[in-house]
Curated annotation (Swiss-Prot):
Catalytic reaction annotation: (S)-4-amino-5-oxopentanoate = 5-aminolevulinate
Keyword Transferase applies: no
CDD domains for the chain: OAT_like
Native species: Magnetococcus marinus (strain ATCC BAA-1437 / JCM 17883 / MC-1)
Subunit structure: Homodimer.
EC numbers, comma separated: 5.4.3.8
A GO MF label: transaminase activity
GO cellular component terms listed in the entry, alphabetical order: cytoplasm
GO biological process: protoporphyrinogen IX biosynthetic process
Residues with the N6-(pyridoxal phosphate)lysine modification: K272
Stated name of the protein: Glutamate-1-semialdehyde 2,1-aminomutase
Superkingdom classification of source: Bacteria
Cofactor(s) needed: pyridoxal 5'-phosphate
Record PROSITE patterns: AA_TRANSFER_CLASS_3
Amino acid sequence: MDQRGGTMSRSASLFQQAAGLIPGGVNSPVRAFKSVGGIPPFIREAAGAMMTDEDGKSYIDYVGSWGPMILGHAPKEVVAAIQQAAVRGCSFGAPTSNEILLAQKLIELVPSLEMVRLVNSGTEATMSALRLARAATGRDAILKFDGCYHGHADSLLVAAGSGLATFGVPSSPGVTRGTAKDTLTVPFNDLAAVEACFAQHPEGIAAVIVEPVAGNMGCVLPRPGYLKGLRDICTKYGTILIFDEVMTGFRVDLRCAQGFYDVTPDLTCLGKVIGGGLPVGAYGGKMELMNQVSPAGPVYQAGTLSGNPLATAAGLATLEAISQPGFYETLTSRTQRLTVGIGKALDEAGIPHVSYHIGSMFGLFFTDAREVYNFADAAKNDHNRFKDWFHCMLEEGVYFAPSPYEAGFVSIAHDEAIIDLTIEKARKVAKTL
């Protein structure tokens, strides 16, 4: 039986089959619908703003593969770039000209980048950036924020958001005490707590790593002055400031969140959008830091598929498309139209909530609170109401993230007609909650 009370025969069968072959039946935990219950639709194909499952049901997609699909699914220019690259070879394990072109484009667009290294995932990017920060400072401790998720490297699975928040665990078995000891955590949006943490660790902190917009606890915005305050504190203590822009990179703005908020970190981590839907990641920053990375320097990092020709081709095509005049104005306007419309629908139904949006990211919290500024606030989300909302919208053919701790995403393929249809469905569902 599925979440709609009927049968989802093909997806149900596939999920059952997958469970005997893949842990939990999925290759990333949140996809299993543990937080909301029911059987996840197995997706057969997608185009534009729409996805179709193995049972033939179509959905307006606001997950966007968890962020990368800023152009929508299967955009012609990206598909063509991948096809043209594939006939020349899928992987060489040797340098290619497209790696240079993608690096040049990233350095051109992202304020903090003077040099960049391509990797295969956001986790690889954050893991490598932290290793570099520790090597450059000679310090061990890192500071992160409750509810911020930076990938599944051991040192970053302490008080993490996203999947760990979804499953209600503060860390993961297998993370050693020694690793956890070197990972310090404080609440997001609390500069006093950051200062206090530095005061308590006179031996010094190697790096502060932060999502400039906390998308892994449901799109929580930084308070005015918060990011600049982090910049000032890190400069004061000789600590490396790392912006994890794997999610916010090119979602908030063409210059990423750092350009939007006019705060320049020492290192930046990227992923998702820069691969156009293919596996990719990157980390970069000041030349003096990046020249410490092997083979230019002693800090080792490598990858068989790093700089993959298909991923770089897809990334270049995507970055070219989003660099066109008016792209972000249109995308931001549509995201605002969606969140304002859903908010009005919930208001009309008398359902307490808080919503946020920035660029093409958005978050919705079912709460009596007037604002959500940290993980403790986000955790007050009414999970039962969220489950009802999720399943009712899914029944209406609208696919939101199956967890209250995940941001939503709008693509340029979500035109006003699709946005308005979503709002109409939200108004219908809100009356039933």
